[in-house]
Design a protein with these regions (language model features):
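Active-site-proximal alpha-helical
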Residues: 181-274
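Alpha-helix boundary/N-cap detector
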Residues: 2-5, 223, 283, 287
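Active-site recognition of the HExxH zinc-binding catalytic motif
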Residues: 104-117
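Active-site scaffold of zinc-dependent metalloenzymes
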Residues: 49-100
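N-terminal mature-domain "stem" immediately C-terminal to a signal peptide or N-terminal signal-anchor/transmembrane
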Residues: 1-61, 104, 331-333, 337-340
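Non-catalytic terminal regions of proteins
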Residues: 12-13, 241-407
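Post-HExxH zinc-binding segment in Zn-dependent metallohydrolases
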Residues: 117-179, 183-211, 229
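Sequence context surrounding c-type heme c attachment/ligation sites in exported
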Residues: 96, 104, 127-128
Length: 407
């Protein structure tokens, strides 16, 4: 039993890596790697039973339960480690390039371990704000323009990079004017959380982040913030200022860059990017429209539940949640809602909720329902995908099913 060749090469490269961020030492960060057969732990003692010591590393048979994605993980003994799943990595066929790719990925996740051990206002991001992040053509177009100018600035080398950087800041300001405070905070914090992890990864690779203006209109705000944050950090490096401490103090990367290169400088739009943004926004709207139409087209009776005083959102699946209109959300897989003497739980049955915001639910609609049962004054539906429990005297029969109004 020996370390996979790519991991052996990656550990050698990590040991030789230059300083990438003050106080960050991937050479001493515990690294957890699943090779498809067993899990390897390097740079630390696991602090739990079940591991075997082999060739200077620790081995767990199969995939360790703590490791389910490329991410920072915590082992049962409390050890924080950078986790990587080799089967999920598309490693190059060349052994040297495979080792380099794996090393860069481990360094990225190791930076998240560093972040977890380094308290800073730069890290927490209100990720739920991504669920309601504006998806219109103006926001998408400005993102594409900013991506274009960030790429020009990075490619300028020793030439004039500050002018395109200021153009990028102009389009950022245009975009941020369309966002509310929560959306702006989400973006700037994702840039310091995920963007800086990509920054240290690309510094290790002596490369820049992949910036594609044509793809930018289609990218999610979260996915784009990896690239924008890394790009801003690389540009800050060119200023020669000790900017990393300012980031740890909570200052957004773009604000720091503005302080170094000057105020945003207007730049004319690119018609092709404007058209691509409109097409992306139209496709997004069409997708939401199709999802909503499919929801309403479900055969069978419907239940309309309302409560002027509000219902409590107990849980939901953010990966299967769609904002289909102002204050209107389609929960495509799972949601739990509670109200006065009432409960609704779905796991595989879609639900439409309405209210002032995601968590302030005032109306709930379900369609495609089976026949309910009535017992002991309760009106109930119980299936493998759906639980509805309501006071029977509050349920009214309607032409399309039932309605309930709770106090």
């Amino acid at each position: 039993m020996h370390l996979p060749a790519a991991l052996t090469g990656a550990l050698t490269l990590i040991a030789r890596a230059p300083a990438l961020w003050p106080g960050f030492a991937p050479q001493r960060t515990p690294l957890l790697t699943f090779d498809g057969t067993r899990t390897w732990l390097n740079h630390a003692d696991p602090g739990e039973d079940g591991w075997t010591h082999v060739d200077g590393a620790w081995v767990w048979p199969g995939r360790h339960p703590s490791l389910s994605a490329h991410t920072a993980v915590t082992l049962p003994g409390g050890l924080g480690a950078a986790g990587v799943l080799l089967p999920d990595l598309s490693l190059p066929g060349d052994p040297d390039q495979a080792a380099r790719t794996l090393a860069a990925t481990l360094i990225h996740e190791a930076f998240h371990v560093y972040q977890g051990a380094t308290p800073s206002p730069a890290w927490p991001a209100p990720e739920l704000a991504a669920l309601t992040y504006p998806a219109g053509a103006e926001v998408r177009h400005a993102r594409a323009e900013e991506t274009h100018w960030l790429r020009v600035a990075l490619r300028a080398g020793a030439g004039d990079w500050t002018t395109p950087a200021r153009h990028a800041l102009h389009w950022r300001a245009r975009r941020h004017a369309q966002l509310d405070a929560a959306h702006r905070t989400f973006e700037t914090r994702m840039e310091t959380t995920e963007g800086l992890a990509l920054y240290v990864e690309t510094r290790f690779l002596a490369d820049h982040p992949d910036l594609d203006p044509d793809a930018a209109p289609l990218q999610t705000p979260r996915g784009w913030s990896y690239r924008s944050g890394a790009a801003l950090a690389h540009l800050l490096d060119r200023t020669g200022t000790p900017w990393t401490g300012e980031v740890l103090a909570g200052h957004p990367l773009a604000d720091l860059l503005t302080g170094q290169v000057g105020s945003p400088l207007p730049a004319a739009p690119h018609p092709d990017l404007e058209g691509a943004a409109q097409a992306a926004a139209d496709a997004h709207d069409a997708d939401l429209g199709a999802r909503l139409a499919a929801f309403h087209a479900q055969p069978g009776p419907a239940l309309h539940l309302s409560s002027p005083g509000g219902l409590r959102l107990g849980g939901f699946d953010p990966m299967n949640l769609h904002a289909v209109g102002p204050g209107t959300f389609l929960h495509a897989r799972h949601v739990q809602v509670r109200g006065p003497d009432a409960e609704l739980l779905t796991v595989g049955h879609s639900v439409l909720t309405r209210g002032p915001d995601l968590f302030s639910v005032q109306e709930v609609t379900l369609r495609g329902l089976p026949a309910p049962t009535a017992h002991g004054g309760r009106w109930q539906i119980r299936t493998p995908t759906l639980t509805v429990d309501l006071p029977g005297d509050a349920v009214q029969v309607t032409p399309d099913g039932w309605s309930v109004r709770l106090g």
